[in-house]
């Protein structure tokens, strides 16, 4: 039921299930503007442990009144009224959050009102701008609001050129150099992470391309494609008489076929030494040999020779890099095969379900 717990501030307080309209207020909250807000100690103590400690202290009598006096100073009177009303009925309007969000955040932290602090953290975070982000960040650090701190840091990172032109940033540079250093360090770390992610994506794309190239080499040497087939001899110009149509990875496969044709007829190719294109082909064949697990029956040229030779690089650093490359390409190939297998299985299941539905429909007709 509704209760009347204010006299001059015009803020009505609501309580659910319990009626306090017949209970006399025993606490008087005084604001900076000397506004008096009557309240019930039972309500205040049930929500805020800080107010509980204040209420339990020996009572001081003021002007013959037996009410406990609690002073909440340093914030607007209306903000205190909204704060007290929240203790009775946990609700804050958008307009109140717009006007008193930062004040309510400070009050919720000081008086340990967790529910209000969570709402203020979210509400204030939604209202961050280039002009107020520095002030909100400082308040968030004082109020131990890590989520709001992180949001402000990210905002400054994304719009740093705009933020550094504001008065808040200039004030920060003059009066809080340690916070400025923390912000710049956060921006530097974020940029470093972004560069690492970009490099990782480029590397993953490279491994996927090499994995696709390995599959295309096996496809060319086993099944054949438009230009080169399994009956081709890399040491002469002969090609398959029957040429199949383009495969699903034709863009990669076509380039490899041209590379294989060149490798077969290049006059500079002598014991692995030759032009750049020949060296590239040798590297691809060597990479295939390193990840191939069927070298005895493999139809890719030089696969068995490279496997048996077990060649070693002259430098250990190069050998280590090569091993890492082989391992990651093999992993990318395995993941690609797994995804393709799942896709094929789903297509088969979908086809079977469709056939079952057609069969059932035909029976019903």
UniProtKB/Swiss-Prot annotation:
Region (CaM-binding): 315-338
Keywords from the UniProt entry: Cytoplasm, Metal-binding, Nucleus, Ubl conjugation pathway, Zinc, Zinc-finger
Pathway annotation: Protein modification; protein ubiquitination
Boundaries of every BTB domain copy: 25-96
Places the protein is found: Nucleus; Cytoplasm
Motif placement: Nuclear localization signal: 193-202
InterPro entries referenced in this protein's UniProt entry, alphabetically: BT1/2/3/4/5, BTB/POZ_dom, SKP1/BTB/POZ_sf, TAZ_dom_sf, Znf_TAZ
Gene Ontology BP annotations: embryo sac development; pollen development; protein ubiquitination; regulation of DNA-templated transcription; response to auxin; response to hydrogen peroxide; response to salicylic acid
Disulphide bridges: none
A Gene Ontology cellular-component term: nucleus
Free-text comment on this protein's domains from its UniProt entry: The BTB/POZ domain mediates the interaction with some component of ubiquitin ligase complexes.
Quaternary structure note: Interacts with CUL3A. Interacts with GTE9/BET9 and GTE11/BET10 through the BTB domain.
Identification of the protein by name: BTB/POZ and TAZ domain-containing protein 1
Organism of derivation: Arabidopsis thaliana (Mouse-ear cress)
Lineage start: Eukaryota, Viridiplantae, Streptophyta, Embryophyta, Tracheophyta
């Amino acid at each position: 039921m509704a209760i009347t717990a204010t006299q001059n501030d015009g803020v009505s307080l609501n309580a659910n299930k319990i009626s306090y309209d017949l209970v006399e207020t025993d606490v008087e909250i005084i604001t900076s503007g000397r506004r008096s807000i009557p309240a019930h100690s039972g309500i205040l103590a049930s929500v805020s442990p800080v107010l509980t400690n204040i209420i339990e202290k020996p009572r001081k009598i003021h002007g013959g009144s037996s009410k406990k006096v609690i002073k909440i100073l340093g914030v607007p009177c209306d903000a205190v009224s909204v704060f007290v009303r929240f203790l009775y009925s946990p609700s804050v309007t958008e307009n109140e959050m717009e006007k008193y969000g930062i004040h309510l955040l400070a009050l919720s932290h000081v008086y340990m009102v967790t529910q209000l602090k969570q709402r203020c953290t979210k509400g204030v975070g939604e209202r961050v701008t280039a002009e107020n982000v520095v002030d909100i960040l400082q308040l968030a650090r004082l109020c131990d609001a890590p989520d709001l701190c992180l949001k402000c840091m990210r905002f400054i990172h994304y719009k740093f050129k705009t933020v550094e032109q504001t008065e808040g940033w200039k004030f920060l540079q003059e009066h809080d150099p340690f916070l400025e250093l923390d912000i710049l360090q956060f921006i530097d770390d974020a940029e470093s992470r972004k560069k690492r992610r970009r490099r990782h994506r480029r590397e993953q794309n490279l491994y996927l391309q090499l994995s696709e190239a390995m599959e295309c080499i096996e496809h060319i040497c086993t099944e054949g494609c438009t230009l080169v087939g399994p009956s081709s001899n890399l040491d002469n110009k002969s090609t398959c008489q029957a040429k199949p149509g383009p495969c699903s990875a034709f863009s990669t496969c076509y380039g490899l076929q041209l590379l294989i044709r060149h490798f077969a007829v290049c006059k500079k190719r002598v014991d692995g030494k030759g032009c750049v294109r020949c060296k590239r082909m040798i590297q691809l064949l060597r990479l295939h040999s390193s990840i191939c697990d069927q070298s005895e029956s493999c139809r890719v040229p030089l696969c068995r020779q490279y496997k048996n030779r077990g060649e070693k690089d002259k430098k250990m650093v190069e050998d280590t890099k090569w091993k890492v490359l082989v391992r990651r390409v093999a992993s990318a190939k395995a993941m690609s095969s797994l995804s393709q297998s799942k896709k094929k299985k789903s297509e088969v299941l979908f086809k079977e379900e469709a056939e079952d539905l057609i069969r059932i429909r035909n029976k019903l007709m």
